Amino acid sequence: MTKQKIAVLGPGSWGTALAQVLNDNGHEVRLWGNVVEQIEEINTSHTNQRYFKDITLDSKIKAYTNLEEAINNVDSILFVVPTKVTRLVAKQVANLLKHKVVIMHASKGLEPGTHERLSTILEEEISEQYRSDIVVVSGPSHAEEAIVRDITLITAASKDIGAAKYVQKLFSNHYFRLYTNTDVVGVETAGALKNIIAVGAGALHGLGYGDNAKAAIITRGLAEITRLGVQLGADPLTFSGLSGVGDLIVTGTSVHSRNWRAGDALGRGEKLEDIEKNMGMVIEGISTTKVAYEIAQNLNVYMPITEAIYKSIYEGANIKDSILDMMSNEFRSENEWH
């Protein structure tokens, strides 16, 4: 692939790691963010200490606070901003774009209020005149491992297989590999909802439960993610792939996962506001729990784990009681998909 110019919007942990992957592949990478001190640090010290204490970035990676400069004459734009500001940033990009680009996103969440997936937001806010079909970059990936060039396999999903293949070539190298998929609904739904299950898995650990319980919540969590995804139009096979069970395993079993750590703290009795303050990073699983619960209620989809987490976070229920209540639910077949 010839050298591409790529704007990465969002210099958080994942945005920074993906910027490094793209830089390793010989592309011109421009990181954009709105925290002046952070951008200056990346440009002068070539570090991003808030997220990576011992990592030095390549000096060729340039960071910007001016969005217009960051996206000027680029071939593609990668959104890696929190769900809650995706629409705002997309509006800003739409007002500045002067040529057609490939639009990608690597965030995982659902918009509160509208319940929309992030690709839908980008489609709504950026005119088709200035963009490709949206490409979703998602899968089992800790930024802490990708940044040290550990082997990582994820998915590039788009309704346009040509766009997905472009992104596959853009990122893939000897340690980072992408597989294509056309099931955007499934890939995005899996990526968003696994954060809820990760909160639950962390809570089980914080409460002192063992591996049996953790395996149970991951597998039954996958079942309810699939139930909702299929109801929304996803291909059930997607949930057995990298962006489904793969992402659920890595997020639901690792201390690298901020959602798992948040759940662990909840299980140990910490208050949510203290957890969010101490972590200093966005915990997408918290807001996604509310959105997923509302969607499930509207569509009458059985999601007991999501409901238990919702009641604990938003209704003040005791997390242990909420989990134990599931043990007295009506008996069901393992293969019920409704």
UniProtKB/Swiss-Prot annotation:
Sn-glycerol 3-phosphate binds at K108, G139, S141, K194, D247, S257, R258, N259. Its EC number is 1.1.1.94. It is found in: Cytoplasm. NADPH binds at S13, W14, K108, A143, R258, V282, E284. It is an enzyme of class 1 (oxidoreductase). Pathway: Membrane lipid metabolism; glycerophospholipid metabolism. The keyword Calcium does not apply. GO terms for cellular component: cytosol. The active site is at K194. Keywords: Cytoplasm, Lipid biosynthesis, Lipid metabolism, NAD, NADP, Nucleotide-binding, Oxidoreductase, Phospholipid biosynthesis, Phospholipid metabolism. GO terms for biological process: carbohydrate metabolic process; glycerol-3-phosphate biosynthetic process; glycerol-3-phosphate catabolic process; glycerophospholipid metabolic process; phospholipid biosynthetic process. It catalyses: sn-glycerol 3-phosphate + NAD(+) = dihydroxyacetone phosphate + NADH + H(+); sn-glycerol 3-phosphate + NADP(+) = dihydroxyacetone phosphate + NADPH + H(+). It comes from the Bacteria. GO terms for molecular function: glycerol-3-phosphate dehydrogenase [NAD(P)+] activity; NAD binding. Its main location: cytoplasm. Catalyzes the reduction of the glycolytic intermediate dihydroxyacetone phosphate (DHAP) to sn-glycerol 3-phosphate (G3P), the key precursor for phospholipid synthesis. Belongs to the NAD-dependent glycerol-3-phosphate dehydrogenase family. This is Glycerol-3-phosphate dehydrogenase [NAD(P)+]. It comes from Streptococcus agalactiae serotype III (strain NEM316). The gene is gpsA.
